[in-house]
């Protein structure tokens, strides 16, 4: 995965992503991260990045995502569709 130097504030809904991920520490609600469950994330292109910890991210005033992985030098925010479906959330795709 190529590094994107932009400070992304939008989330990409990813059907191939198994966890919510960000590279932006400022998005996490906690000052102290929870310990990661794995050391590295391997992407589809076989590149890998170091996992720095886990936290929560607010997506609105009253909603947040749990167990968001903070990934070193990740220039994207990835929202896992499979994690949303595991929470019985309905995800609908369509044309604009």
Give residue ranges: language-model regions.
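Anionic group-binding determinants
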Residues: 1-96
């Amino acid at each position: 995965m190529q590094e994107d130097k932009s400070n992304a504030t939008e989330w990409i809904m990813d059907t191939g992503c198994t966890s919510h991920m960000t590279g932006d520490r400022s998005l996490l609600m906690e000052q102290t991260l929870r310990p990661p469950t794995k050391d590295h994330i391997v992407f589809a292109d076989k590149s890998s990045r170091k996992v720095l910890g886990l936290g929560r991210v607010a997506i609105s005033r009253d909603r947040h995502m749990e167990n968001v992985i903070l990934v070193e030098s990740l220039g994207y925010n990835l929202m896992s569709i499979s994690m949303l479906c595991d929470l019985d959330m309905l995800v609908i795709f369509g044309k604009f």
